[in-house]
A protein has these predicted regions:
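Hydrophobic alpha-helical connector segments
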Residues: 59, 70-103, 121-123
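Helix-turn-helix
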Residues: 13, 17, 21-55, 59
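Short linear capping/connector segments at secondary-structure termini
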Residues: 73-74, 106-113
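Hydrophobic/aromatic residues within well-ordered alpha-helical segments
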Residues: 60, 64, 68, 89, ...
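Amphipathic alpha-helical packing segments from all-alpha helical-bundle domains
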Residues: 111-160, 172
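C-terminal peripheral helix-coil segments that are non-catalytic and often amphipathic
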Residues: 130, 134, 164-214
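Short, hydrophobic secondary-structure boundary micro-motifs
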Residues: 104-109, 190-194
Length: 214
């Protein structure tokens, strides 16, 4: 194994171990020392790849969002409407947070972190522009940025509901997020209603926990 492969192996071990420990113990209760010990790597090796625990968490969150997109692409390859494809991705994330409070807790931490939240919004804004640019040719970068902030706010709100009153059902959370996000991204009311029903029907084909199995 060359040096590059070894370095990537260590990085992978750290992320996978941190993911497991964050779920088992919680983010705040997990230390870098615990991660390095459980991963079987030195403390210095972690700092070679990540500045701090938040950096590991950012890498984990970024991968999770990419994996959700891969699941959407795989399970719904026949869906050509970009609004529908994005809605399915958003719904998978809401479903995972609704089913397992640990997912909601980690998302709550991610949205509360200025560093992580900024990265999520930046990467999501670019993705949304790439996906919806043809549908919204007159939109500027700031238009997509503002709509992404609306989505983030809706996601953060349903996560807060899960962690506080737990009043809404999973379906109600999905409907709430999709209504706000699709309206924010310029979808017509009749289009939103149709997408909502197609997403809820399609969710039966997806295991939201595919992202969280170890």
């Amino acid at each position: 194994m060359n040096r590059s492969d070894q370095s990537e192996r260590v990085r992978r071990q750290v992320i996978d171990t941190a993911k497991r420990l964050f779920f088992e113990n919680g983010y705040d209760q997990t230390t870098l020392r615990q991660i390095s010990t459980a991963a079987g790597v030195s403390h210095g090796s972690i700092y070679h790849h990540f500045a701090d625990k938040e950096g590991i968490f950012l890498a984990l969150v970024t991968e999770a969002f990419d994996e959700i997109q891969q699941i959407t692409d795989r399970e719904f390859s026949e869906a050509r409407d970009p609004y529908l494809r994005l809605s399915l991705k958003w719904a998978i994330l809401v479903a995972a947070a609704s089913i397992d409070v640990r997912v909601a807790e980690l998302l709550d931490i991610a949205y509360a972190s200025k560093k992580i939240s900024t990265e999520i919004v930046a990467s999501s804004t670019l993705r949304h522009r790439n996906w919806l640019g043809e549908q919204l040719p007159d939109w500027t970068d700031n238009d997509f940025y503002a709509a992404t902030l609306v989505l983030k706010g809706a996601m953060a709100a349903v996560v807060e509901d899960k962690l506080s009153t737990d009043r809404l059902s999973m379906e109600e959370r999905i409907r709430s997020v999709l209504r706000a996000a699709l309206f924010g991204f310029g979808a017509a009311p009749d289009q939103i209603a149709e997408i909502l029903e197609r997403v809820l029907d399609g969710m039966a084909r997806v295991d939201p926990f595919a992202l969280y199995k170890f």
